[in-house]
Structure formats: structure tokens, C-alpha cells
Amino acid sequence: DLNGAAFVHIESESESAQSGAEHFTLHVPAGLLDEQERMVPVTLTVPGIHNARNASAAIIAAALLGVDIEKAAEVATSFLGAARRFQVCGTVSQVTVVDDYAHHPTEISALLDAARRRYPRSVIRVLFQPHLFSRTRTFAHEFAEALSKADDVIVTGIFPARELQRDFPDVSAMTIVDAAQDVPHASAQGDGTWISAVDDMQVAAQMLAMRCRPTDVVFTVGAGDITAMGAVILPAPGARHNLGDR
């Protein structure tokens, strides 16, 4: 159900996101909008249960303000998402690159849940750039747990933003990798080989590109300049035409 609104329920079609859309039914009990129970079908062009929840909250809010709920649901269908939120950059040789601004463990967890719904049969690879040394230190284990939902992860050097590395001499990409050693992972054999640290972002992107096979999906994740690495992993068509055939 919706967070903080137990009287509104979402019934999601688990396979729907594979088509690139999220289909669900919004159940509104009698007495909330009128005397009748309402069951409103909704289709979103953006995947993820978190997006379904956000859209449902917006639809209900609009309905409570007097907008016809079916009309509100229809308008929600036109929402194309925000830049750097599950933004598909392109596909070469059946390898797809998706960029996302997620930089907190909760965001990363939601992103990878959506990735599994959208690409249930694909290998999910992640190039993650941590944001802030302090956040990396505080949430290292939570980052590791969230990233464990991917099949293959490379953590790059930390984007410092307002902080200075000299103030955090013991914090690096390895802080997350070390924390991941105790995190269970279905694709690994308990040795943490699903995650590694490569400080140089360009090198990390090239390494991840070399691992790709057809139908793989690569996510560039973080609030820093990691977004530029999509061009490294996914060059202009023809620039590396054998991507995914290695």
C-alpha cells in the first residue's frame, strides 16, 4: 500500500515493467472520494514500484482537489520521467546503458529493484560513483547491501563535492568494497568477487564495457560526473561495433 496511506492500495502487474511501462490498479475505498469504491487502472512509462507509489499519491491528491480521478490517471501516463532518473542512453550490440542520479542507498535499492522488473532476464552491471566521503563512510554497509542487487559492480573514486579528501584519509571506494565482504550475493560464492574498486572512472568504465555481453544492461549511478561515462561504455554507433561480442 502507499506509505502513510494504508487505505489506498496498489495492485501491480509484476510482468508489466518488461515492456518499459508500469501497469497497476489503484484501489480507492468508498468514502475517500465518494460513496463508491473506485478501481482505477494506471499506466506509467517509467518503471519501478516507487514510481507507482509516487504517481498514486499525485493522482489521489489531484482527485481530492476536485480533478476527476480517471482524468488524473490519464495525465499521469504522459509523465516521461526526469533527467538522470532511469534515463536510457542507448543500445549498441544489444548492450543497453542507463544513467541514474541515485546516490543514497535507498535510492540505489529502488533503482535496482526497478531494473530487475524492467530487465528480468538481463545481467545488471553497475558503475557507481559515491558522492561525499562522509556519506560513504556513514553508509558503507548500506551501499553494499543496495548494490548487491546487481550482478556486477565497479565502485569508482568518490566525488568530493564540498568535501576534501584530506579530511577523510581512510575513506575510498574500497570502503564500500570492504563492507560488501559480509553481504550475501547470489552471483558470487561468498568471496565478494561481484564488486570491485577502480578509482579512475574512465578505466572503470572501459573495464565494465569489456565485460558486457548481448542483453546486458549497464547502469551509471551517482550524483557526480559519472553520467559522462555512458559515452565510454556506449560509444557512437560503429565506434566499437563489436561491443558485447567479446
Regions found by a protein language model. Name each.
Residues 21, 52-53:
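Short N-terminal binding/cap micro-motifs at the start of the first secondary-structure element
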Residues 37-38, 47-50, 57-246:
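ATP-dependent carboxylate-amine ligase
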Residues 1-39, 83-85, 89:
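Extended acidic/charged loop-beta regions that coordinate divalent cations
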